[in-house]
Amino acid sequence: MKKEDFTQLIHHHTEYFNLREFCAGNKEGMPKKQEVKNVMITECTAGTGGSRFVSISTRNCSCFSVYKEYGPTGIIRCKWVTFRNRDAAVGKKYLFGPDGKLTAAEDEEEGFGYTPHQVIQFCRENHINLFSEDTCIERYANRRNKEFYYIIRYLGRYQEKSGIIVMFLNGHDGNPERVLVTDAGL
């Protein structure tokens, strides 16, 4: 499988959310899903009284999603790339002011020696289904204490045990530091 360059999925430019299109025939602000050119786009409202709008785009067969959040006027607030359909940012995280001007670009890779691509390879080698709704990859970074982890949650097997697996990989070298196995109740 071809290695995806997640750094090319977003840019630092201002963007706008089409509020009129989202709200057309959608008074309750229900989530909308659509597929455009092999990209699944989910749009929804969030926050109190729809104070923000969120768009999550995932290409077919991609291990990454693009998360974008917009204010009530439709101007971009922030955007970043995540592991497929989750919150943990990888690469650059772009933050924008109320006028849509870029205010910060945070490097989410700082402190991690083990790359997102290496985590994906680890999952493939360990038969973890990256495209299952039961699988998610999160990240934890405590820069003050220099603690960095990837947290992989999936439904499956680990060393002869089956259930919900929660695996903590060292963010520096990728070694599993802790693995929890919970009965899935199946």
How would you describe each model-predicted region?
Residues M1-N85, A89-L95, K101-E108, T115-N142, ...:
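Periodic aromatic/glycine/histidine/acidic cluster detector
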